[in-house]
Amino acid sequence: MDINSILDIDKTISRELFLDCTYYFEVLPKIKNYIVKLGNSLDKNKYKEIDTNIWVGENVIIDKLSTIIGPCIIDDNTEIRPGAYLRGNVIIGKNCVIGNSTEIKNSIIFDYAQIPHYNYVGDSILGYHSHLGAGVILSNLKNDKSDIVIKNGNEKIETNLRKMGAIVGDNTDIGCNSVVFPGSIIGKNTSIYPLTRVRGVIGSNKIVKSMDNIVNKEIK
């Protein structure tokens, strides 16, 4: 699979960050500095700096029981629900939902993505209109703490990253209580059944019933 064809980078305020990358994961170490640079250049009539290095767009709803640590950008019409924990270095797109007891750190969430219930998203990128079911975990650290290697068919890609979660393609849905292993890449328009252990590279337009039972999705 072409792992660089699963995201529409026009569907995020961070588009510029992706332009010079060979692989999407290369943006992960750059998120913190990029947020500060971008935040200070935003239209102050539209984006408000509500705390140090935390910028919020128009019509954003932030529950008083949520926690937001900068640097962080939350784009227009997004809802941050009670108990959400944005742990720093996070870009949230337009019209997103970040829900109860969801923790996100060092990640980019594209427009219209939904992470609504009891999720962990670490060092990850979630594409346009992607959705995580309740309890989905995007794990970002191997048990042996070694650097993450992406295996794409016969190709091995050295990330030189100790922490990397998942890259989830546009319009992809991951079912409840699934666990996605570090360094996983999931193509666009793919559906993953609940309670699935996801690892490696999964193509676009697939239905993942289990890692041993992946079928093509009918395109309507």
Give the residues covered by each predicted segment.
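Phosphate-binding glycine-rich loops and adjacent basic patches that engage nucleotide phosphates
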Residues: 1, 38-44, 56-59, 87-96, ...
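Terminal amphipathic alpha-helical/low-complexity segments used for targeting or macromolecular assembly
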Residues: 1-53, 58, 189, 195, ...
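A generic structural signal for ordered alpha-helices
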Residues: 2-9, 52, 56, 74, ...
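Glycine-rich hexapeptide-repeat left-handed beta-helix
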Residues: 14-16, 22, 109, 116-220
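Short secondary-structure boundary segments
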Residues: 64-96, 148-154, 158, 209-220
